[in-house]
């Protein structure tokens, strides 16, 4: 296999980290993930929306932390030993941490197997999903953090 074939293969697949929020599984494109850390003390910030939980200090960098559960209209976070903060690096918003119930695994999806989602107007959560990935374990809703952070 030469370099050209490797590049084509890389473009045809996407690595996704599978996370759990409540009873649902979601996927986060690995290219946006900078770090995954255990839960730690989050310093509250006054006069911010409820889904913005506060900030953490990660190796000298102050990073805002949000609850994706609250942003998506799910019940309040249930923090336990499996809870993690995923640090995302986004071009438009810099670094931000998101609280997840569990980081499950990394899966590789074929780009062709990702189906786009069309909005049906019934559930606002669909606005935060850019596609559905098909893998051996079933279907994974792929989170669109540009939409989650847009408001």
Description of each model-found segment:
Residues 1-151:
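An acidic, low-aromatic, low-complexity terminal/linker signal
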């Amino acid at each position: 296999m030469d370099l050209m074939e490797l590049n084509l293969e890389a473009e045809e697949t996407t690595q996704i980290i599978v996370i759990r929020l409540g009873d649902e599984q979601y996927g986060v494109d690995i290219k946006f993930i900078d770090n995954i850390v255990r839960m730690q003390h989050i310093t509250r910030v006054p006069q911010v929306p409820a889904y913005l939980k506060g900030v953490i200090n990660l190796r000298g960098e102050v990073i805002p932390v949000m609850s994706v559960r609250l942003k998506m209209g799910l019940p309040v976070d249930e923090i336990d030993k499996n809870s993690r903060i995923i640090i995302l690096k986004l071009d438009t918003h810099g670094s931000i941490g998101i609280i997840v119930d569990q980081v499950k695994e990394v899966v590789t999806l074929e780009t062709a197997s990702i189906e786009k989602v069309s909005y049906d107007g019934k559930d606002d959560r669909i606005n935060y999903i850019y596609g559905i990935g098909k893998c051996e374990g079933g279907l994974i809703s792929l989170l669109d953090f540009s939409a989650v952070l847009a408001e």
